[in-house]
Amino acid sequence: MTCAYIAFTARGLALAQQLAAACPGSVARGGADGVRLTDWTAAQFAQSDALIFVGAAGIAVRAIAPHCRSKAADPAVVVLDEGGQFAIPLLSGHLGGANELAQRLAAVCHAVPVITTATDGRGVFAVDEWAKRQNCAVAEPERIRCVSGALLAGQSVCYAADWAVSGMPPAGVEPAAAADRADFALTLTPTGEALHLIPRIAVLGVGCKRGTTAEKLETAFAAFCAEHHFAPQGIVRAASIDLKKDEPGLAAFCRAHGWEMDFYTAAALRTAKDRFTSSGFVQSITGVDNVCERAAVLAADGVLFIPKWARDGVTLAVALAPFAPDWRWKNDEP
């Protein structure tokens, strides 16, 4: 987690430096002798995972208000008074990790963590916190309240999962009789009205003709996801053959999605283990019978999930890294 601290007094600055020594991050001083708060907040909202204000809560609220977008996008925001008595998560308590961060910071300076989210206050299962713990993206953040609201009202909720989830489900959480009856689902292929939690375990294997533009790759990728009902939020990186290292369109496409690229030689691709779609033409050009499937499997160190798909000179495939979800959702659970 990338943290950024700001304080407004000498006492607050000393506390910020103490906190940063335990939870590393940059430290700035705001006010007449320091950075401009509006500029600092805008910059850190764009580049940091967590913003920590050491000062009045009202200062933090006014500073962050223009930048708040959604549960899924906003960084964690925590405020501590300059005396280090209280640590209050203001924004992104679960998905952004502000609740956990507030507790960590409170432990450093012996403050009281002030956690105000209803599920935490009542000890009720928090589906968004569980998603974060399992390294899942939340496809529809607006549906979180439906699951949490039902549990807070004393009702049960049903889940579906495409993987076995180890351990005992939390109180009030039961397996759905059918996938289309689930209130929330752990899946890479979301359908229906459930809250979908998308494991970040997928690697996109890419093959393309020389000179393929980012726009053409984007169009192909959108069609690929639509045809397979695949959630793009599950992709964590992309992979291809080293012959594509200098393709500007491929680089721009991956950069737009925030994916790093892995490139493999033909010899390395031939070592991949799975059942692959073989092409004599691809073999004659690249020295290996398949690029997208083999590259995805190697980069994921896992198994092929969606086999080779081709359109307009673009080939795509998806492989999955090993994934073993469990029902732990609190940091103090073993």
Language-model segments: which ranges?
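Extreme N-terminal starter segment of soluble prokaryotic enzymes
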Residues: 1-5
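Polybasic, low-complexity association/targeting segments
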Residues: 6-10
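Conserved mixed alpha/beta catalytic, RNA-binding, or beta-rich assembly cores of soluble enzyme
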Residues: 12-18, 25, 34-36, 44-50, ...
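Conserved beta-strand termini and adjacent loop/short-helix elements that scaffold enzyme active sites
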Residues: 29-32, 116-118, 264-266, 307
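Conserved acetyl-CoA-binding loop-helix of GNAT-fold acetyltransferases
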Residues: 41
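Long, charged alpha-helical interface segments
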Residues: 148-175, 274-296, 300-310, 319
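Terminal alpha-helical anchor/extension segments at protein ends
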Residues: 203-207, 220, 288-334
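C-terminal non-catalytic interaction/assembly regions of soluble proteins
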Residues: 237, 241-294, 300-304, 311-314
